[in-house]
Amino acid sequence: FLTSGHGLILGGHSWYWSYSNSDVAHNYPGNKIAPTTGLFVSSNSGSAQVTIGATPPDRMQRTLAAVTALQNHFTTGPLIPSSDASTVEKTISRSTAMLTLDFIDFWNPLRGMVNATGWTEIAENKKYDLDADPIADVMLAIQEGLYLRLPANELVAHPSAVDFPGAVPANASRVTEIVSVNGDYIGLPSGFGYSGARSHGMMGTGLYAAAGEVVNISVPVALVDQNVRIQIGAHSDSLWGKDVLDRHPKIHRNWVIDSTTMHVGNTFGGLIFITFPPDSTFGIVNVTIENAVQAPRYIAGVTTEAEWNMTQRLLPAPWAELEGEFFILTVPSSEIRSLDSVVELMEWWDTAL
């Protein structure tokens, strides 16, 4: 219908749809139609006021034109003028947030640029000013788009991971463990709305993925294609709204479980979680995790104070979890190495809450 020259009006948006669904580019119903026009519906929200001018839009608002301009900027020239830099940044950044790696006309040139320029390093002693340089900002967005999409066997340890979330000790052993997780998760009542009522529940494993390393995880068939995920990294926030960064904006990664055998990883490393959607009733499930690092973990009513003091707090991963009845603390392991009274601490928090 569209390709034969007819018109179509699409009503609706994908930002709310994207809260409980994945892969906007392929799975959002409107994007099964829109690409034939050269357009996509993104999951971003925007202003309801749109001014349609008498002249065509800036050419740099076209994705491939912006990619070509950026590629030329780093190779043959010309340099992108300052008057176009912000437009190029916004155009490409919107696409990196949505387009998957199979959009090769978009991603292949960008991957070549990252290979040539290297990774942007951000650390406590090497801060990054957002909005100071649109070209640097768009390269940061491109790098993020890649490390959140590359298959596990193509990931490398990000140079910034040593600073945050921290390095795994060089002598830390890699282990294989069978871990039991609770697959029953109600979620918050829908009335919580924007407070993440329909967010997944994170179930800890006590294991850590080293930066850039492949972790193999085997799960029961009952979890496959049920919107159950593997999350690597406890920090699921985004810092893109800040003015100054002392770590990268996004350092966690989710893998949707679509097979009984998953190969996962994170360029920054992080604690390993199995996350369940609201209204899950899977019961206790056993997952096998291979090539991970043991992390300090206290579970109220399960871990004894002797086990904590003699074994758990000494485990090598750089982040630890303390689980009370109502509250979980996720903290750098350096903060708990000398914590002797973990039972008293978590009982205090449970009483307070």
Task: Put a short name on every predicted segment.
Residues N27-G46:
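Post-HExxH zinc-binding segment in Zn-dependent metallohydrolases
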Residues L8, H13-S18, V41, S47-T51, ...:
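Solvent-exposed loop/turn segments at secondary-structure junctions
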Residues F1-N27:
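Short alpha-beta junction capping motif
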Residues N309-L353:
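Catalytic cores of extracellular degradative/oxidative enzymes
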Residues T288-L322:
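Low-complexity, Pro/Ser/Thr- and charge-rich linker/hinge segments at domain boundaries
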Residues I104-G193:
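Glycan-recognition and processing domains
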Residues A152-P296:
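Beta-strand-enriched, solvent-exposed domains that form extended recognition/catalytic surfaces
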Residues D58-V138:
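Eukaryotic non-catalytic protein-interaction modules, chiefly N-terminal intrinsically disordered
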